[in-house]
């Protein structure tokens, strides 16, 4: 999820994209979903992509109806989002990143202590490094591996 005022996650995703590119993973994509579609028009998103110098060859910015976005975020990804006048942009949202595989499953991974990670904190560079490893691992393994699989 993305709120255009939240640049830390975007900068970390730029780094993630750069690191994953070194492995030449064919089906890797980043999807950023605007949680403020009333303000984040297609033109605003295009300007944001340009101003942040984002490589949009495999990074897509999505928007839609507020109700549908909030339902997808809350029910599909199990992340928080909502309106809050005291939050930047009047919207609160999770800064977490999830991995969704080619079959539509939300994938878990392991942290350095071998604890299961359900989401990755988009504001932490240490989680970006974990994401790179998980994405590389998923690109090299069979769909039926020994990790937890949760249908989104």
What kind of feature is each model-predicted range?
Residues 46-94:
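Short, internal strand/loop/helix patches
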Residues 1, 33-38, 54, 65-67, ...:
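Solvent-exposed coil/turn segments that connect beta secondary-structure elements
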Residues 26-31, 57, 93-96, 102:
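Envelope-exposed proteins and targeting segments
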Residues 18-22, 50-57, 74-78, 105, ...:
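Sec-exported extracytoplasmic/periplasmic mature domains
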Residues 9-12, 41-44, 69-72, 127, ...:
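Stable alpha-helical elements in mature extracytoplasmic
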Residues 1-48, 52, 59:
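Membrane-embedded segments
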Residues 8-12, 70-75, 96-107:
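Conserved long hydrophobic alpha-helices within structured protein cores
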Residues 86-152:
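Thiol-/selenol-based redox modules, centered on thioredoxin-like
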């Amino acid at each position: 999820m993305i709120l255009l005022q939240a640049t830390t996650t975007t900068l970390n995703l730029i780094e993630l994209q750069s690191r994953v590119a070194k492995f030449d993973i064919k089906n890797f994509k980043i999807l950023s979903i605007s949680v403020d579609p009333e303000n984040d028009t297609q033109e605003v998103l295009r300007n944001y992509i340009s101003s942040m110098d984002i490589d949009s060859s495999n990074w897509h910015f999505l928007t839609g109806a507020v109700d549908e976005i909030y339902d997808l975020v809350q029910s599909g990804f199990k992340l928080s989002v909502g309106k809050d006048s005291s939050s930047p942009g009047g919207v609160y949202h999770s800064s977490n990143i999830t991995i969704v595989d080619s079959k539509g499953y939300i994938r878990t991974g392991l942290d350095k202590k071998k604890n299961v990670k359900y989401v990755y904190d988009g504001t932490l560079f240490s989680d970006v490094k974990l994401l790179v490893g998980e994405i590389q691992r998923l690109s090299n393994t069979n769909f039926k591996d020994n990790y937890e699989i949760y249908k989104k």
